[in-house]
């Protein structure tokens, strides 16, 4: 099998991780082109990878005849143009979230893909590939807990970049719980409310942190999410589903060593997202590469999933301003060549 030739657009933290991942741990693929707005950085990275070149213009990188598929790790504001270019070139693309930065363009991207008659876009919600979430999904689908009634989530970060504002806690952090709610429960989210507890004195000036999100699904299930991104402690992600016949919780033991001693108890916590979800990223990219080789092109969250997440987060930002529940407005689901909707798009087997 000939290696898939991949262009990685954006070689910041996430993009550089993907370059290292594809180069060292993914089979059936190699990095052929890298691109970044910091041209010298891209050139230095390309020089360290056999057979790789740096291309200054992202659209030229997408159109390059030596590129079979694209990993998009550029800032969200550039995604619309770059995704449209991938569609025009009929090249499969793994797009890190967000699909785009607003609801209307996300919907337009999903519709444009559908018009082509073939799936090309996968969105990087990596939790669907995490072993614990996969097992929780299987447990729910198998009926062990009976009817799922509610879910409790914790999403904590030790800190965030200086540019982070209150709305990004919704759009950049809560978005993962939005997608995992749709994935686990197999239904859309009907409304969202953001509640503002007492703010952390350590949060940047003007940033509302922590926040509590209340999601209600179309069937009436409720999901509460604690979002606290300036804990100064560790990276913690936990999810507990409560059903009619019991409950199940994940995220307790990853990176945690519990210790007992004379009069003491303690352990260590996961320092960052790489340590917690590194294997999930590896699985995500490997399955995407395998899907492109097979011709299916998508093995996980679709453009519709990216659009639905954008719509929920837009309602969340509105609720952040008003404090009131806001209904989620979704367009009619597009007719797509890929398995759209939350029940069918949970990944390849």
From Swiss-Prot:
Domain of life: Bacteria
Coiled-coil regions listed: none
Xref: SUPFAM superfamilies: Glyceraldehyde-3-phosphate dehydrogenase-like, C-terminal domain, NAD(P)-binding Rossmann-fold domains
Pfam families, A to Z: GFO_IDH_MocA, GFO_IDH_MocA_C
GO BP annotation list: inositol catabolic process
UniProt keyword terms in alphabetical order: NAD, Oxidoreductase
S-S bonds: none
Record GO terms (molecular function): inositol 2-dehydrogenase (NAD+) activity; nucleotide binding
Catalytic activity: myo-inositol + NAD(+) = scyllo-inosose + NADH + H(+)
Enzyme class: oxidoreductase
Transmembrane segments: none
Entry EC no(s): 1.1.1.18
Its biological purpose: Involved in the oxidation of myo-inositol (MI) to 2-keto-myo-inositol (2KMI or 2-inosose).
Subunit structure: Homotetramer.
Family in the record: Belongs to the Gfo/Idh/MocA family.
Protein name: Inositol 2-dehydrogenase
Chain's gene name: iolG
């Amino acid at each position: 099998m000939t290696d898939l030739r991949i262009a990685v657009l954006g070689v910041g933290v996430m993009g550089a991780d993907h370059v290292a991942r594809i180069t060292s741990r993914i089979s059936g693929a190699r990095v052929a082109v890298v691109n970044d707005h910091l041209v010298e950085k891209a050139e230095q990275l390309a020089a360290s990878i056999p057979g790789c070149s740096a291309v200054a213009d992202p659209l030229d990188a997408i159109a390059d005849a030596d590129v079979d598929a694209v990993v998009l790790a550029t800032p969200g504001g550039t995604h619309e143009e770059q995704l449209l270019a991938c569609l025009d070139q009929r090249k499969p693309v793994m797009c890190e979230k967000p699909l785009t930065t607003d609801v209307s363009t996300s919907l337009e991207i999903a519709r444009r893909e559908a018009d082509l008659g073939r799936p090309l876009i996968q969105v990087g919600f990596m939790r669907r590939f995490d072993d614990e979430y996969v097992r929780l999904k299987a447990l729910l689908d198998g009926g062990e807990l009976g009817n799922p009634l509610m879910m409790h989530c914790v999403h904590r970060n030790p800190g965030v970049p200086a540019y982070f504002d209150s709305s990004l806690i919704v759009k950049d952090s809560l978005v993962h719980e939005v997608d995992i709610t749709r994935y686990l429960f197999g239904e859309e989210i009907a409304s969202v409310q953001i509640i503002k507890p007492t703010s952390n004195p350590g949060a940047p000036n003007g940033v509302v942190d922590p926040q509590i999100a209340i999601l209600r699904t179309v069937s009436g299930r409720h999901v509460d999410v604690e979002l606290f991104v300036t804990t100064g402690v560790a990276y913690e992600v936990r999810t507990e589903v409560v059903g009619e016949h019991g409950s199940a919780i994940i995220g307790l033991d990853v990176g945690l060593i519990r210790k007992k001693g004379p009069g003491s108890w303690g352990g260590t916590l996961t320092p960052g997202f790489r340590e917690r979800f590194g294997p999930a990223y590896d699985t995500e990219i490997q399955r995407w590469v395998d899907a492109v080789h097979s011709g299916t092109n998508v093995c996980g969250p679709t453009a519709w999933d990216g659009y639905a997440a954008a719509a929920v987060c837009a309602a969340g930002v509105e609720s952040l301003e008003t404090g009131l529940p806001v209904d989620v407005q979704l367009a009619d689901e597009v007719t797509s060549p890929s398995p759209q909707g939350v029940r069918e798009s949970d990944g390849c087997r």
